[in-house]
Regions:
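Rhodanese-like catalytic fold shared by cysteine-dependent sulfurtransferases
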Residues: 2-15, 19, 25-76, 85-88, ...
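Short hydrophobic beta-strand that contains or immediately precedes a catalytic carboxylate
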Residues: 82, 90-97
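Surface-exposed acidic loop/strand-edge motifs in secreted or periplasmic proteins
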Residues: 96-100, 105
Length: 208
């Protein structure tokens, strides 16, 4: 088990887009559909979760901004509650951190190194499902894996997370509710709080 600060770097693409961070990478941009890599943004330090209202629909931009304290229909869990669920194996942990694909048309001879992603040990990484607008292909990917991970049981506890102040986990938890899942858990503080309480992390690969 590895206990380290999450540090990930994604190589600059030919178009000049970079994704970087210590799992504190900024997930922002305009109202775009995935899988456009997110751009760098700064979290507003003045806003607080209890002042952020729940939107009627999904967040489609500025994904690294303070999130609401609630998600209607879901249960918000603390790091300690998430730890207890993880220890007894009573919930499926689903990481929705975005994954930057290999840039197309790389110059000949360029070596592409897949960026490492460290997350909660034994979690399932469903990459790029947290954007506000999903392609039909990505939404089908999400539905298929939720069906698989829940074993077809709509009451199976599903815990969604990303980073602290990351709307992608909020979006995905909201989508799961719209699909009829009734035991949706939102770990809003994500891997940041997980590490702060000394819980283990491990390298994950996206679910195919």
């Amino acid at each position: 088990m590895r206990r380290l600060r999450l540090f990930e770097t994604v190589r600059m693409t030919a178009a000049g887009i970079a994704v970087a961070g210590a799992l504190g990478v900024a997930l922002a941009g305009g109202a775009f559909a995935e899988p456009t890599p997110p751009s760098i943004a700064v979290i507003d330090p003045g806003a607080k979760a209890d002042t952020v209202a729940e939107p009627d629909s999904y967040r489609t931009d500025e994904y690294r901004k303070p999130v609401p304290a609630t998600l209607k229909g879901a249960k918000v869990v603390s790091a300690e509650e998430a730890s207890a669920l993880w220890s007894n194996g009573s919930a499926v942990f689903i990481d929705v951190y975005p994954h930057a694909p290999k840039p197309p048309n790389l110059p000949a001879g360029t070596v592409w190194r897949e960026p490492q992603h460290f997350s909660i040990e034994n979690a399932k990484w469903l990459a790029n499902v947290g954007y506000g607008v999903l392609s039909a292909e990505t939404e089908n990917y999400l539905k298929r894996h939720l069906e698989r991970l829940s074993g077809g049981d709509k009451a199976k506890p599903l815990l969604f997370f990303c980073l602290r102040n990351c709307w992608m986990s909020w979006n995905t938890a909201k989508r799961a509710l719209s699909y009829g899942y009734t035991n949706v858990l939102w770990f809003a503080e994500g891997t940041d709080a997980w590490q702060e309480i000394g819980q283990p992390i491990a390298e994950l690969k996206p679910e195919p």
